[in-house]
Amino acid sequence: MIAAMMVLGATSAFAGDSDALKAVLKAKTYADAKALVEQNLGSMANDAEKAKAYNHLVELSMKQFNDQQSIIQMNQITKKNDPVDMEAMNEGAYNALVAAQECYKYDQLPNAKGKIAPKYDNNAERVWNARIQLVSAGDDARTKNNTTLALKYWNAWFNSESSPLFNKIPAEKKAEPYKEQVAFLGAWLSKENKDMAQALKYCDVAMNSDEYKKQALSIKLEVLKGDLKTHEDSLKYINNLKDLYAKDAKNEILLDNLNSMFASMRM
């Protein structure tokens, strides 16, 4: 009995990858691997397998990104002008960032022994440059009037800054002098795209810049104000103005808006 249990335990401890994971790891393209991950994730043996599957997505998408980046670098060195597939490069960067965050999520969960033993901590450094590429990718899409694509790339870049995946990235490396400018543009695009929650997030960052503070505040007030269809909407907007004014009592724009609302509400 004991011997049989030991055999079963040994079999479990040294079991190979599940068929679901093997199928993912055999995939040679990101599209095929992603489809298999979505199809087979629930059939994988444990969280470690899920992390391994998402890491395979990181590898495939980073190859797509790095292949095009290498052409750019060689063009600079050799003074050639070999074609670069920027669409493939940008999509590779985006997919790598998304997959790395999913990999991290499963990689940080306790194993069967209750211990956290991450295997893919290097993904943070690995995808950092890909993350930064999304700033240029979003701006390129913006100049081509592709708002949806611009926000896809910028939102991924912006929202991932607070991801625990990047907790160990040095502060000096995280410094991004263009952040407030992109946040301002992102706020405006998000408002136009009716994504008000994301617009407010961008506004809060853009308002940290003297250059964009006034314009970002105007966008924020427009978003907070909304349509003011009901009395409750107006009261909510007034309370939002009060909260902002309490933090910036010298701001005449906020004071003017408050006085205007008080007058309209006969308060």
At which residue positions do the language-model features occur?
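Generic helix N-cap/helix-start motif at coil->alpha-helix transitions
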Residues: 14-17, 129-136, 175-185, 210-220, ...
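Start-of-domain marker
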Residues: 14-69
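Structural register within alpha-helical repeat arrays
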Residues: 20, 40, 50, 57, ...
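Residue at a conserved register position within TPR or TPR-like alpha-solenoid repeats
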Residues: 24, 61, 141, 183, ...
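Structural motif corresponding to the intra-repeat A-B loop/turn of tetratricopeptide repeats
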Residues: 27, 57, 64, 144, ...
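Alpha-solenoid helical repeat scaffolds
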Residues: 38, 98-101, 155, 204, ...
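Short coil turns that delineate tetratricopeptide repeat
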Residues: 45-48, 108, 162, 211-212, ...
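Short coil/linker segments at helix-helix boundaries
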Residues: 62-148, 152, 156-180, 197, ...
